[in-house]
């Protein structure tokens, strides 16, 4: 299955490249996008460029990675066709799982785009490597991210502290489409 260009009912999902740097940086530098994990915010274009480098390496290694989401048509004044609504997709991590990732601009949140993109990404990952579990790791206070994981058919398989998070009271939830080995959970929950 070709995964670098997918179409859904409302979205065009394309591989993120350095041509997207300005829009990717604007998304990842937006404090509203990172309200659940402020330490993740990109404070420089160089950090966003390094992020795109890692995406491109992942495409070469995995055959799937992070996709940019653009509306296939105008969806109103705040969401004209062709703009980058966000990024998301599935990436192979630890050679043992598909990590489900999604991040939307504030204007694009609350319209069902995350669920639409996640379904396409999960279907593509399952076609490429059905032997790997689909996993989403989310912060407990990020209710919308939890809802997206649940809509993708994932179930909570772990809850505990979020090591490495500057907020020592943060709680991490791991969702998966099947039971995970103790070893993989241990790997996912280390700092």
Model-derived features: where do they sit?
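Juxtamembrane/interface motifs at transmembrane-helix termini
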Residues: 43-46, 55-57, 71, 105-107
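A short helix-loop-beta-strand connector motif used in the catalytic cores of GNAT acetyltransferases and
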Residues: 55-68, 75
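Short, P/G- and charge-enriched loop/turn segments at secondary-structure junctions
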Residues: 1-2, 54-56
């Amino acid at each position: 299955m070709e995964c670098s260009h997918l179409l859904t009912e409302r979205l065009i999902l394309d591989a993120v490249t350095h041509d997207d740097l300005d829009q990717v940086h604007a998304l990842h530098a937006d404090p509203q996008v990172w309200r659940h994990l402020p330490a993740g915010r990109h404070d420089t274009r160089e950090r966003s460029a390094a992020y795109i480098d890692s995406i491109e390496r992942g495409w070469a290694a995995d055959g799937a990675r992070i996709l940019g989401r653009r509306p296939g048509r105008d969806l109103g004044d705040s969401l004209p066709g062709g703009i980058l609504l966000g990024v998301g997709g599935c990436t192979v991590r630890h050679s043992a799982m598909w990590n489900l990732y999604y991040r939307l601009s504030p204007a694009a949140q609350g319209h069902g785009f995350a669920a639409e993109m996640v379904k396409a990404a999960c279907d593509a990952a399952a076609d490429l490597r059905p032997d790997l579990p689909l996993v989403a790791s989310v912060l407990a206070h990020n209710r919308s991210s939890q809802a997206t994981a649940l809509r993708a058919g994932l179930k909570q398989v772990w809850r505990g502290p979020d090591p490495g998070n500057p907020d020592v009271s943060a709680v991490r939830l791991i969702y998966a489409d099947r039971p995970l080995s103790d070893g993989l959970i241990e790997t996912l929950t280390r700092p």
